[in-house]
């Protein structure tokens, strides 16, 4: 029941998951304190280069099935903050490998026939026979969620092993699947859980013909366009307290070990410690790196919630983000591009985006106070440990001399007039084989601690968006707040609205997928009684 004295929740981490949790709790009348190491996690102060030009830590797209983020923009009355859906191109040392069209522009057919027909002429080098070799993977996808035990069997296999057992051709693996995974899950298939790999490929590419359609922020940054309006509303209307430049250093628990009572913090600017008292619950919207650091300094909490300690031991992936301002406009056919198999990448995957094409109406904003000169390129390197060891100039030279000219030779004659290179070590979750049980659950052993993020196991609140995904992170944040409210761990003062925040499901599976799963389950459940499995699951 609503009360006159609302509960107090501390949300640690101000990514999509943290903001989702803050929204669901604030709107239920709960008092919320949101803390993050960023100087200004509200998005009100744009991230900028030393010369005052805008910068963003990674260029992230918004796919077709992002219903809850779309609903957020409508709720905030933001108008259209996105580009149209765009094409993408895939490049290797051999040149253009494939282009991804805007699938929604063509006649809509059942999946995967629609994707096959829409791209029949888009693969420039990969023979049809190699493309068809992926058929076995579609059967495995039908089997993936038959039951928990089967899912964990797939989770324990690395994706490359599964691909080979399914007899997917080497060319299909190396020229298509490997590049996709290096920029989708940020690791090569031999280092990824087969289960998460199939979830990603299904959600982003195979669920519907137009699942792969993607659009981008059409001016400024995601933080400025989406998070800043949300944070402003939560602060103005719901008294959200935001502490930027602040790290959570310790969780203190009650003497009986049943709940969190306070959160110790550390200011990055001053080094001073402080304590947030009267805490009723905590939302951990952090990754493995943050979880490990926090549990190391919270021994009582670590002892009571060993699953959080295990989560902190999971691997994480290094990312390098680069932005280049050029003295001339370089024409590139597609605004979004993937680079793979180049020796200069040293095993990483890379993307680059022509921001002057994605944001043509606001080019002056891309240049800050300087006059507009030419193209602005944003590039991200994933699985980038080796790349990160290069100097800033070495990374820029790698792009301008070895990678970008392979896409468009005019890059060779362009001059870089400004640049910014930033490294983000261990910043992205690694879904390694067998990692499912190590990933943190949404509801933990301590009832007053919940987890949120795209790496979190959502259990009975599981959502259709999968992998490294803004929509999944945001929804998991909403559900983390909902969990605290539903279980009455916290209560608010709001009486005019339902306590739990609504979550919009993604589009339903197509009939042929539902039918295929049903038939597979009927057959395989019977065969399981005799100890028979699909051949690719036999040890």
How should these model regions be labeled?
Residues 17, 40, 289:
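Conserved Rossmann-like nucleotide-cofactor binding loop
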Residues 7-34:
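N-terminal Rossmann-like FAD-binding beta1-loop-alpha1 element of flavoenzymes
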Residues 47-72:
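N-terminal glycine-rich dinucleotide-binding loop that anchors FAD/FMN and/or NAD(P) in oxidoreductases
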Residues 103-106, 325-326, 331-539:
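Conserved flavin/dinucleotide-binding core of flavoenzymes
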Residues 28, 217-218, 246-377, 382-388, ...:
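Mid-domain catalytic core of redox enzymes
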Residues 136-259, 266-269:
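Active-site/ligand-binding neighborhood in enzyme catalytic cores
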Residues 70, 74-75, 79-198, 486, ...:
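Mobile amphipathic helical/loop "lid" adjacent to a hydrophobic cofactor/ligand pocket
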Residues 26-49:
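Glycine-rich FAD pyrophosphate-binding loop
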